[in-house]
């Protein structure tokens, strides 16, 4: 009975669409950012709490690990933290993954994004592989993106054609910048602790600072 239960659990995980969240670090000369992917793990924990029944979420820190997984399958959505020290690395992964699977939804989120509307447009226009960029609280933005895309069977152009405004999120459609309302987290308790939920357990085994 236990073996059958394990098999059913694995089968259900395989069938559920995969959403991967990455906070990458350079590793050519040691681990450049040798800390836990804390910010991304909060987004991961909140998204899993809200949508874990329907999607299989996974958290990545190391480029080699992400590259190996991408060789096996393409997820439904690939998300990246946007920090200045790893931005180009994330962009390279995003562009290659998008080229391999044009239907892949690519989401970026983080502080490495302009505040001026014109600069936002230029930023996204130069990076067409980025489908959506989430500002400020990534937790609310990512969940809203997933929920909206679910209504459109994850067809990005269909969603964008209706100029859907997504919380904390900007995107380009037909040379227009579409930005949703900004919502801040008012109660930190709505975000599950990634330490208590086990989201960061695997990273304790690695040479990283919690």
Labelled PLM ranges:
Residues 1-13:
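Short, Lys/Arg-enriched N-terminal segments with co-localized hydrophobic residues
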Residues 16, 37, 163-166:
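A structure-centric signal for secondary-structure junctions around beta-strands
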Residues 43-49:
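A short, N-terminal amphipathic alpha-helix
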Residues 189-190, 194-210:
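Radical SAM [4Fe-4S] cluster-binding motif and immediate context
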Residues 7, 28, 150:
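Phosphate/nucleotide-binding beta-alpha loop and adjacent structural elements of enzyme active sites
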Residues 46, 54-184:
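Glycine-rich beta-alpha loop elements in corrinoid/cobalamin-binding modules
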Residues 17-30, 77:
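Nucleotide-activated donor-dependent transferases that construct or modify glycoconjugates
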Residues 28-40:
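Glycine- and acidic-residue-enriched helix-capping/strand-helix junction motifs
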């Amino acid at each position: 009975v236990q073996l059958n239960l394990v098999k059913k659990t694995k089968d259900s995980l395989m069938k559920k669409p995969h959403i991967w969240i990455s906070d990458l670090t350079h590793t050519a000369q040691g681990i450049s950012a040798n800390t836990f992917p804390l910010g991304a793990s909060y987004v991961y924990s909140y998204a899993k709490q809200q949508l874990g029944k329907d999607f299989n979420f996974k958290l990545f820190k190391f480029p080699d690990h992400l590259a190996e997984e991408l060789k096996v399958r393409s997820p439904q959505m690939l998300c990246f933290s946007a920090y200045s020290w790893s931005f180009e690395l994330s962009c390279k992964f995003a562009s290659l993954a998008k080229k391999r699977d044009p239907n892949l939804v690519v989401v970026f989120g983080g502080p490495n994004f302009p505040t001026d509307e014109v600069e936002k447009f230029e930023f996204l226009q130069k990076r067409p592989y980025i489908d959506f960029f989430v500002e400020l609280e990534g937790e609310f933005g990512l969940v809203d993106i997933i929920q909206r895309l679910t209504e459109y069977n994850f067809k990005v152009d269909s969603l964008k054609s209706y100029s859907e405004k997504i919380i904390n999120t900007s995107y380009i459609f037909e040379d227009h910048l579409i930005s949703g309302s900004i919502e801040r987290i008012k109660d930190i308790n709505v975000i599950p602790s990634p330490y208590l939920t086990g989201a960061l357990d695997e990273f304790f085994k690695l040479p990283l600072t919690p």
